[in-house]
UniProtKB/Swiss-Prot annotation:
Residues reported in the UniProt entry to bind L-methionine: E59, Q102, D247, K278
Any GO BP: S-adenosylmethionine biosynthetic process
Gene that encodes the chain: SAM2
Chain residues that bind Mg(2+): E12
The organism of origin for this protein: Saccharomyces cerevisiae (strain ATCC 204508 / S288c) (Baker's yeast)
Designated name of the protein: S-adenosylmethionine synthase 2
Length: 384
């Protein structure tokens, strides 16, 4: 028997206090505040952050009455930046707001006067969805573990078990996989990388010991670790200055962290700060729903789907499927199954996936496809 091929694959994730992630969360907090009062809000909200300053800018058309200052400060407080000693303070930071109405040229192209089903796509673009059978969540193990390491650090910071932790954290996980005719089978964890912002008083040696014991060993399945697993915990040594003080932040700069950790192609459009009329978000969620449904139905072990849209046109212009040789049917047959089971017009997706609700802030941390409670994570029963 020939030895099956193994390979290494890596994904990274970042914590809630990473400057780009702060911006994603602020943008989605504003979106949620709009949708809470007006489900038909049209929102394209960007955020930028640097030392002592948050700026929100973009186009919002809504009947909602918003206190932007309060929304921004509440979001930063929840993340955990409540003291300038941590590099950022929700109480004293400067909040700048430059929000205008949606362009009437864009609005007229979407045909709001028609029924919701015929709502045109809010822009052109390509979206990808991906699913794999290697984890119950249908996500690559690399990105799932990278997210879980950051989640565990946030929990340990909030419950006081690691009180020296600060909100800005980064993780990276390398898994050794076996390629089983296109299916990815995780064999072992090759490398774990963690960098965590910390209080000044803890030594690097103590920090490394505690992160290894209280984070790595609790999150990573023991049977995936071996004597050859490599650990790079706080490889830079000191990391006291973090968050927006250490680095500027922008909405939409962590789109690989938000999605599939590099295991799938990327459409290029970010998710956060956009309402459901923006297919960058709604159609990417739908593509995940389709991919996950195909794997759950046993039609394939791993799949990527691509959709494309044009502004003002409701129906997608194209569908593409790649099952990596893991499918029980041809790709053409699978495309027909998708067409038969899914209506991919944005105005239909908003109803089927219930997207006109204030549900988006939690998606802005630890990936948009990690929380299994979301509608797009629940596979549809397919007829074929």
């Amino acid at each position: 028997m020939s030895k099956s091929k193994t390979f290494l694959f890596t994904s990274e994730s970042v914590g809630e206090g990473h400057p780009d992630k702060i911006c994603d969360q602020v943008s989605d907090a504003i979106l949620d505040a709009c949708l809470e009062q007006d489900p038909f809000s049209k929102v394209a909200c960007e955020t930028a952050a640097k030392t002592g300053m948050i700026m929100v800018f973009g186009e919002i058309t809504t009947k909602a009455r918003l206190d932007y200052q309060q929304i921004v400060r509440d979001t930063i407080k929840k993340i955990g930046y409540d003291d300038s000693a941590k590099g950022f303070d929700y109480k004293t930071c400067n909040v700048l707001v430059a929000i205008e109405q949606q362009s009437p040229d864009i609005a007229q192209g979407l045909h709001y006067e028609k029924s919701l089903e015929d709502l045109g796509a809010g822009d052109q673009g390509i979206m990808f969805g991906y699913a794999t059978d290697e984890t119950p969540e249908g996500l690559p193990l690399t990105i799932l573990l990278a997210h879980k390491l950051n989640m565990a650090m946030a929990d340990a910071r909030r419950d006081g078990s690691l009180p020296w932790l600060r909100p800005d954290t980064k993780t990276q996980v390398t898994v050794e996989y076996e390629d089983d005719n296109g299916r990815w089978v995780p064999k072992r964890i090759d490398t774990v990388v963690i960098s965590a912002q910390h209080a000044d008083e803890i030594s690097t040696a103590d920090l490394r010991t505690q992160l290894q014991k209280d984070i790595v060993e609790k999150v990573i399945p023991k049977d995936m670790l071996d004597e050859n697993t490599k650990y790079f915990i706080q490889p830079s040594g000191r990391f006291v200055i973090g968050g927006p003080q250490g680095d500027a932040g922008l909405t939409g700069r962590k789109i690989i962290v938000d999605a599939y950790g590099g295991a799938s192609s990327v459409g290029g459009g970010a998710f956060s700060g956009k309402d459901y009329s923006k297919v960058d978000r709604s159609a990417a969620y739908a593509a995940r729903w389709v991919a996950k449904s195909l794997v759950a139905a046993g039609l394939c072990k791993r799949v990527q789907v691509q959709f494309s849209y044009a502004i003002g046109i409701a129906e997608p212009l194209s569908l593409h499927v790649d099952t990596y040789g893991t499918a029980t049917k041809s790709d053409d047959e699978i495309i027909e199954i998708i067409k038969k089971n899914f209506d991919l017009r944005p105005g239909v997706l908003v109803k089927e996936l219930d997207l006109a609700r204030p549900i988006y802030l939690p998606t802005a941390s630890y990936g948009h496809f990690t929380n299994q409670e979301y509608s797009w994570e629940k596979p549809k029963k397919l007829e074929f």
